[in-house]
Amino acid sequence: HGSAPERGDNAIHKMAEVLLNVRDLNENDASDDKEIKGLVKMLDPKYNPEHYEDARFLGRGTCTTSQIFYTSPSRCAVADSCSISIDRRMTAGETYQSCLKEIEDLPACKKYAKDVKVSMYMYDRPAWTGHVYETECFFPTWINKASAPHVQALVDAHHALWGNTRLWADETAREKREGRPLTDKWTFSTNGVSIQGRYGIP
């Protein structure tokens, strides 16, 4: 009861510590003095030796608390459960397993290990046919190298259609046009996460 909170075990107070750890995971750098190394560490070959170059191209991963839920018998009672939803965006070299482990390894999660459960959302909504195909709610990072044949084919097609210069353009516009098309990335998830991200089909 709220009149004697010391007799209870306040789940919201415990979650408050987890929330601060999640914020640190997103905002900290990766220096040796940090207990929680920030997600920016994946841009460093020390932490991501096989994929750091792709991670630098794509950008660092991020995490943010997007929802919080609790249960309590009433407004004048100690909360007996609390859960959060974390929106975690991955970069090259990360997997959903590594992302879950990062949360499990947060100091607050270890401190309250017997009370903490870290899991992934599952999609289980029925299709229009009524069929339910349960699957993990994660969207793997993917990248197509600029040197890949299908990417180069698109660049060649662009050159064939538009060239590299505009004969009618002034010098400033011509300079901006040089080297086009720009082969770059979007910094958010796309529909390619299943076809390319899971199955490697460009």
Where are these regions (language model features)?
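Metal-dependent amide/peptide-bond hydrolase catalytic core
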Residues: 2-202
